[in-house]
Amino acid sequence: MLKVLYVIFTIFGYIWPIYSVMFHLTPNTQKCLKEDIQANQLVMGEYEVSDVPGQIIDYIARDTKGHILSQKEHITKGKFSFMSEVYDAYEICFISKVPPHQRGISQEVSLVTKKGVETKSYEGIGEASKLKPLEVDLKRLEDLSDSIVRDFALMRKREEEMRDTNEKTNSRVLFFSIFSMCCLLGLATWQVLYLRRYFKAKKLIE
């Protein structure tokens, strides 16, 4: 049983969204990392910035409407967390600031983020509920399974919405094409009749 759980947790470890990234931020620039997050989901992160005297890096987390969820100035090393209110694309930006008189150099930024189930402390839950290690593992596996089911349900819903949008767009394009053809035929008919009357008036045709 323990071996089976180990294999399952290993698989989940490869597919579950724990993101770790490291990059270099050039002076007086900003770099943003964007991700789609479900509604009412906790997001936690840890960051660390290489120290360069005289240079400052700020970070800010916000949604697509510009609402600030978390921010801090002059960061070096720390943690942050915020709760998503609605399904949206959220972004975390790191902003470099270097005084005009100083020649800036790139700074290394590392970021690790967790969301949803991975933000829970199952060790604390086990101690509070007096659960055995195996029961804690089963609880974690149950939460992971439920979260994956919700993710797939959301993906299916978005796929259906996109399909409906495509079908509506195709219907509108077809209607517009038919309408355009009718307008062109009407214009061509009017031109023929107008030219016929014009030539008759000029007695060029009978």
From Swiss-Prot:
Primary site of residence: membrane
Pfam families referenced in this protein's UniProt entry, alphabetically: EMP24_GP25L
Example of a GO biological process term: endoplasmic reticulum to Golgi vesicle-mediated transport
Bilayer topology annotation: Single-pass type I membrane protein
Signal peptide range: 1-20
Transmembrane segments: 173-193
Membrane topology (Lumenal): 21-172
Residue ranges constituting the GOLD domain according to the UniProt record: 30-140
UniProt KW keywords: Developmental protein, Membrane, Signal, Transmembrane, Transmembrane helix
GO molecular function: cargo receptor activity
Cytoplasmic compartment residues: 194-206
Cellular compartments annotated: Membrane
Gene Ontology CC terms, in alphabetical order: cytoplasm; membrane
Protein family per UniProt: Belongs to the EMP24/GP25L family.
PANTHER family reported in the protein's UniProt record: TRANSMEMBRANE EMP24 DOMAIN-CONTAINING PROTEIN
Function noted in UniProt: Eca and bai are essential, though not redundant, for dorsoventral patterning of the embryo. Specifically required during early embryogenesis for the activity of maternal tkv, while the zygotic tkv is not affected.
Protein name: Transmembrane emp24 domain-containing protein bai
Organism: Drosophila virilis
